Amino acid sequence: MLTLLEIARLLRRAKVTQGPAEVSPELRGWAYDRQPVKPPAYLGLALSDFAYGYCPTGRSLYLKYVLGERPQPTKPLAEGQALHAVLFKALEDFRRYVYSGAPMSPPGEGMPEDLRAKAEALYRYIAVRLTGEYQYVLASRLARSRDAAAFYAAPIAAQIAVDGAPLGLSYVVADGVALGAVVEFKFGPSQNVDVALAGYAMAIEAEYGVPIDYGIHVQIAVDGQVEYRASAYVLGDAPRAKFLEARDEAIDVVASARDPGPAPQCPKTCPYYSVCRS
């Protein structure tokens, strides 16, 4: 989705406008053996269940982890999951195209009929962008090999999974990593993205012991045509501290089996809406 040049520009702009990344040693993910990174308990929570702050009171955590309620599928969530799968398929198919010459073909089987048009539009958009960039860097001699040209066109290593246990989490799957930055794609409403990105960064730091100082949020809209907006964040002390605060509050709700009660207003897209309001 994002080319090497785009990501480099995003990170450069973040450094200029937000300043250099300054992270206290005690807030690195690899400091998981001591406070404040060390969790109060090891419950294996999913990062996405709390980091974005979609549930103002955290009652969704109580319903899921204490009462064992299962989330109910909603149309926005199903659409987001389907379009994520299309995006990752396009990235994988692009590499097959580069190394084996296999044609890139939009998803067909298994795609709900009401999402087929959006899925095909997204896939074709990504395919045209990536193959066009790939052919350009080869023709212009910016890259001297297929491997280098593929990196220019698609530098994101997709779906990076790490063990979140050192942070008290379950397995953490970041949408991608590129040029030392963690990348997340969103197709629906999003909030607290810098906090969530900090969480992904710290989980990767805990696993590999390498610093992740920047995060990139890509908001994608698919409605007849594809539009996206990418923003880069410096993952300094502030978002890391907010992430740890949110994690500790989530652990407290689950460990204490405390029902925080429903929020005054809940989005109907919440997968626990019907259970919470019943």
From Swiss-Prot:
- Give the note describing cofactor binding and stoichiometry: Binds 1 [4Fe-4S] cluster per subunit. May not be required for nuclease activity.
Q: Name one GO molecular function term.
A: metal ion binding
Look up keyword Iron and say if it applies: yes
Q: Which UniProt keywords apply?
A: 4Fe-4S, Antiviral defense, Iron, Iron-sulfur, Manganese, Metal-binding
Annotated GO biological process: defense response to virus
Short name of any one Pfam family annotated for the protein: Csa1
Residues annotated for [4Fe-4S] cluster binding in this entry: C55, C266, C270, C276
Coiled-coil residues:
none
What family name appears in the similarity comment?
Belongs to the CRISPR-associated protein Csa1 family.
What is the name attached to this protein's record? Answer: CRISPR-associated exonuclease Csa1
